[in-house]
Amino acid sequence: MLAKRIVPCLDVKDGCVVKGVQFRNHEIVGDIVPLAARYAAEGADELVFYDITASAHDRVVDKSWVSRVAEQIDIPFCVAGGIKTITQARELLAFGADKISVNSPALSDPSLISRLQDEFGRQCIVIGIDSFYDAASDSYKVKQFTGDEAATKETAWYTQDWVEEVQKRGCGEIVLNVMNQDGVRGGYDIKQLSLVRQLCDVPLIASGGAGTMAHFRDVFIDAKVDAALAASVFHKAIINIGELKQYLAAEGIAIRR
């Protein structure tokens, strides 16, 4: 069994790390580089950075902090935010990112996924999917431009269909951001993640809902995801990554030490 990964997520806005609840009301939680260094020292397997307003504001990730992060940490990291061209992706990789992630730009132009895969290889192309459970229709729907509440819109894609589409296009990994669970620390959406797991032939990263160490255990065992992403529990020091890994190992989960 491949070891499971623990992935802190750092949402970046105006040069600072922020965190909201259900993608709203973001508050500043710290500076980018010190937080990245802290999580690397605690034992994170990799980091994900989302420039959350880049796509909505039609710009790309600020490369200056990407290079500073690369100088300070020795674990892989992925960056996302407004990446719409091969050139933009190449620049971010040259500045030190190990993977690039696309979300809203891929919804606007699905062929972007194939072009990135052809240029850089499947292994460094991550697709983020912002999935919202709509109770009225009892369905999972994909939203776009979620980093800016005023710009957020519902797409025509159902989550399951988009998961299948991005794999056909050549993505190497999927991060499923469950919007209803985001920031509330009530546990991962096991039902939705299990559904997506059945459709997913590439590594699947769970995002949204972590509040306790048991939540990580449950998502690995019950949803069979490859990695668990979390933000607020790490930013607020509710959970220490090293202690989390010890707990998971004691629970019989293969974990990178």
UniProtKB/Swiss-Prot annotation:
This is Imidazole glycerol phosphate synthase subunit HisF. IGPS catalyzes the conversion of PRFAR and glutamine to IGP, AICAR and glutamate. The HisF subunit catalyzes the cyclization activity that produces IGP and AICAR from PRFAR using the ammonia provided by the HisH subunit. GO terms for cellular component: cytoplasm. Keywords: Amino-acid biosynthesis, Cytoplasm, Histidine biosynthesis, Lyase. InterPro entries: Aldolase_TIM (IPR013785), His_biosynth (IPR006062), HisF (IPR004651), IGPS_HisA/HisF (IPR050064), RibuloseP-bd_barrel (IPR011060). Pathway: Amino-acid biosynthesis; L-histidine biosynthesis; L-histidine from 5-phospho-alpha-D-ribose 1-diphosphate: step 5/9. HAMAP family: HisF (MF_01013). The active site is at residues 11, 130. It holds the Pfam family His_biosynth. CDD domains: HisF (cd04731). Heterodimer of HisH and HisF. It is an enzyme of class 4 (lyase). One of its GO terms (molecular function) is lyase activity. The lineage of its organism: Bacteria, Pseudomonadati, Pseudomonadota, Gammaproteobacteria, Alteromonadales. It comes from the Bacteria. It is found in: Cytoplasm. Its main location: cytoplasm. Belongs to the HisA/HisF family. GO terms for biological process: L-histidine biosynthetic process. It catalyses: 5-[(5-phospho-1-deoxy-D-ribulos-1-ylimino)methylamino]-1-(5-phospho-beta-D-ribosyl)imidazole-4-carboxamide + L-glutamine = D-erythro-1-(imidazol-4-yl)glycerol 3-phosphate + 5-amino-1-(5-phospho-beta-D-ribosyl)imidazole-4-carboxamide + L-glutamate + H(+). Its EC number is 4.3.2.10. Coiled coil: none annotated. SUPFAM superfamilies: Ribulose-phoshate binding barrel (SSF51366).
